[in-house]
Amino acid sequence: MEALYQSTNFLLQKVQHDLGRLEGTQNEQDAQVVVQCIYGDVITLKENCQTLDNYVSREPPARRQAARMRVDQLRADVHRVDMAVSAVHTRMTQRWRAATERDELLRTRYRPNDTALSIGDHELLLNDRLQSSHTHLDDLISQGSAVLENLKSQHLNLRGVGRKMHEIGQALGLSNSTLQVIDRRVREDWILFVIGCIVCCIFMYAFYRFWRG
């Protein structure tokens, strides 16, 4: 189990490094090669986490709790990286699409009634600004979705950790006051999670209203 855990952790670091490479690519063709490699590694990471879950159930009771917490943390890290990869890929795809549409627009000439009519510099500049606004709005929505998913994942992890701390506390004979402190901390984390979601939604709504004028 330890060997698989270490190799999975190493693969996770490789995916994070490849994610930086993806953001630095200069064209869509090079980026697609990196994207395919990253998605293949993410699939392997998820399969390894599933295998580690099976190994944890076979661990001796004295080591099972600690092993479960390590695997759960690794799974949460894999989930966050997966969400980051999806957000970056979506943002870059939108950027490539906007660049392609802009290039096509620059090469296009409209011919109503067989009369050639080219787009003036002012119209081209206005279109570029509109495309840029759409791209920035899409980026913000993607980042907001990633933040909400990250907050949700952290909340689930905190609930799992709180439950496991209860089990460990009962196994070790911790006092009720100690368990109450743990419960209070979990409730405070839940309140922070809800506040973070509300603030994120308000910010996205305010930006949308501002952008719509």
Swiss-Prot record:
Transmembrane segments: 190-210
Localization (cell): Golgi apparatus, cis-Golgi network membrane; Golgi apparatus membrane; Endoplasmic reticulum membrane
Role, per record: Involved in transport of proteins from the cis/medial-Golgi to the trans-Golgi network.
GO MF annotation: an example: SNARE binding
Residue intervals annotated with topology Cytoplasmic: 1-189
Keywords tagged on the record: Endoplasmic reticulum, Golgi apparatus, Membrane, Protein transport, Transmembrane, Transmembrane helix, Transport
Protein name stated in the entry: Golgi SNAP receptor complex member 2 homolog memb-1
Positions on the Vesicular side per record topology: 211-213
Membrane topology: Single-pass type IV membrane protein
GO cellular component labels: endoplasmic reticulum membrane; ER to Golgi transport vesicle membrane; Golgi apparatus; Golgi membrane; late endosome membrane; SNARE complex
One Gene Ontology term from the biological process aspect of the record: vesicle fusion
Keyword Ribonucleoprotein: no
Subunit: Part of a unique SNARE complex.
Organism superkingdom: Eukaryota
Recorded name of the encoding gene: memb-1
Family designation: Belongs to the GOSR2 family.
Presence of the UniProt keyword Glycosyltransferase in the record: no
Main localization of the protein described in the UniProt heading: Golgi
PANTHER family the UniProt entry points to: GOLGI SNAP RECEPTOR COMPLEX MEMBER 2 (PTHR21230:SF1), VESICLE TRANSPORT V-SNARE PROTEIN VTI1-RELATED (PTHR21230)
